[in-house]
Amino acid sequence: MRAVLLPGSGEQPTAFCYQVNGSCPRTVHPLAIQVVIYLACAVGVLITVLGNLFVVFAVSYFKVLHTPTNFLLLSLALADMLLGLLVLPLSTVRSVESCWFFGDFLCRLHTYLDTLFCLTSIFHLCFISIDRHCAICDPLLYPSKFTVRTALRYIVAGWGIPAAYTAFFLYTDVVERALSQWLEEMPCVGSCQLLFNKFWGWLNFPAFFVPCLIMISLYLKIFVVATRQAQQIRTLSQSLAGAVKRERKAAKTLGIAVGIYLVCWLPFTVDTLVDSLLNFITPPLVFDIFIWFAYFNSACNPIIYVFSYRWFRKALKLLLSREIFSPRTPTVDLYHD
């Protein structure tokens, strides 16, 4: 890092990330503020990793949870956990220091993993919406239509498509050669902002909003059908009524998860598009807040499950007790007392 005096800046020095031409300016925070931000980010990373790790463990360990919907939840939790484990620590340093100090290779890998895990999350939420739509709107055909094999196909697509899509933009020069007029503005040295250009702003918008529109339309239909079922539930047998209520409860919980996802990611996605039209005028601090608000979503789902799913709370209680070592624990029925 170096400090220089800019013309007209008086005595206020400007810091840079590297002692080279084209280096990014660096915002130097007081030590106390740095410590507070590092601690806050560390807590967020810890909640993200441990919360989603428990979801992965619970669905894998308890046999009663081996359902198509829960396998999708497991895969979603895995993406969020890996985001917290592999992406957020380096993002924390970049946010606090306002510079990237880990080299070009890690910059590209970090950007790849960041985009991969975030796109994987939205794909999985979209597939979960399809699952809930089928369970609520077509309950008689649901067991035969949405099997474990179907869920596994969705999981492969949910990871494979984002992996190929992101690799195409980051690890080939096809896009840069074909769209050079869109990519003239190169990031300064020390920013690690490989994808934030005008073309990516336009491309990122439909990648977010098309799945969102699908999810919103599916949940609107689910709401209409669930309301009708609530009026008819008195005429059903007790066992069938219980099954319908359980499916509606799951749809409601996952609908909340989708809603929180939209709220967390909407500011960043809209800003990316608008910023590309206005020649990137968003202050770095505001942009960083939008990014971390989106990251925060990865910590939300386990918290939602704690308040919404009795089986999740029961599994957590077993995990924190000696009963977890009992050979009978994996076969415990978490849905009933």
Curated annotation (Swiss-Prot):
How does this chain sit within the bilayer? Multi-pass membrane protein
Give the subcellular location: Cell membrane
* Region called Extracellular Loop 2 (ECL2), residue ranges: 176-189
Q: What is the effect of changing residue 99 to S?
A: Does not affect trace-amine receptor activity
Name one cellular component (GO) term. Answer: plasma membrane
User: Any S-S bridges, and between which cysteines?
Assistant: 24-188, 99-192
Residue intervals passing through the bilayer: 39-59, 71-91, 110-130, 155-175, 205-225, 254-274, 285-307
Q: What's the impact of mutating residue 188 to S? A: Decreased trace-amine receptor activity
Expressed, tissue-wise, as follows: Specifically expressed in neurons of the olfactory epithelium, to discrete glomeruli predominantly localized to a confined bulb region. Present in the dorsal area of the main olfactory epithelium. Also present in the limbic brain areas receiving projection from the olfactory system and involved in the regulation of emotions. Also expressed in some brain regions outside the olfactory epithelium, such as the hippocampus, cerebellum, cortex, raphe nuclei, hypothalamus, and habenula.
The record's statement on gene disruption is:
Mice lacking Taar5 show decreased sensitivity to trimethylamine. Mice lacking Taar2, Taar3, Taar4, Taar5, Taar6, Taar7a, Taar7b, Taar7d, Taar7e, Taar7f, Taar8a, Taar8b, Taar8c and Taar9 show no visible phenotype or behavioral deficits. They however show an absence of aversion to low concentrations of amines such as 2-phenylethylamine, isopentylamine, N-methylpiperidine and cadaverine. Mice show less anxiety- and depressive-like behaviors. Mice display an increased number of dopamine neurons and adult neurogenesis.
Summarize what activates or inhibits it.
Inhibited by 1-[(5,5- diphenyloxolan-2-yl)methyl]-4-(2-methoxyphenyl)piperazine and N-[(2,2-diphenyl-1,3-dioxolan-4-yl)methyl]-2-(2- methoxyphenoxy)ethan-1-amine small molecules.
Q: Name the consequence of residue 111 to A.
A: Abolished signaling via the G(s)-class of G-proteins
Explain the purpose of this protein: Olfactory receptor specific for trimethylamine, a trace amine enriched in the urine of male mice, playing a role in social behavior. Also activated by N-methylpiperidine. Trimethylamine is present at high concentration in the urine of male mice after puberty and acts as an attractant. Trimethylamine-binding causes a conformation change that triggers signaling via G(s)-class of G alpha proteins (GNAL or GNAS). Also required to provide olfactory input into limbic brain areas to regulate emotional behaviors likely via modulation of the serotonin system.
Q: What is known of its domains?
A: In addition to the well known disulfide bond common to G-protein coupled receptor 1 family, trace amine-associated receptors (TAARs) contain an unique disulfide bond (Cys-24-Cys-188) connecting the N-terminus to the extracellular Loop 2 (ECL2), which is required for agonist-induced receptor activation.
Miscellaneous section? Trimethylamine is a bacterial metabolite found in some animal odors, and is a repulsive odor associated with bad breath and spoiled food for most organisms, except for M.musculus, where it acts as an attractant.
What's the protein here called? Trace amine-associated receptor 5
Annotated organism of origin? Mus musculus
- Encoding gene (name): Taar5
